[in-house]
Amino acid sequence: MTPGARMQAVIELLEQIWSGEEPIDRLTDVYFRKRRYAGSGDRRSIHATLYDVLRHRARLDWWIGRTGSSLEAGPRTRIIAELALEIKSSPQETKAIFNGATHCPAPLSDPEAELAEALYGRPLTHPDMPSPVALEYPDWMDRSLKTLWPERLAVEMSALN
């Protein structure tokens, strides 16, 4: 599979995950059973990117909102952000992945290309992020977790993610 085809697979899986109630492992098993052509390296890469996007969701969404983009935080947008922030793909590399070729994601729209440009070179975690975003836990747990681990919150939450 090409890098673009791998990213398209991640986008398709994220769409299924966020639109249903099926467990992720079951969705990925069914997805790959229907796509026997995907080798073990492809599956490993797709799983790694998929779980990275899930683990980084709050930070990706924060960055997407921070750019002032009119784009909604959805599977495509989060992949673009993941490529720029975590994988460190340049805007040109991101455009090469989103090339519209067979089995690849459709070409980037102008707002998506602007997002890739705006996020490239930035760190995934920013000092202005609130704790629930930076450490990837729900807002409603903030007070309880800060009470439980007043000095070790970052260490403990990093261990969970």
Describe the role of every protein-language-model region.
Residues M1-N161:
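Class I Rossmann-like S-adenosyl-L-methionine
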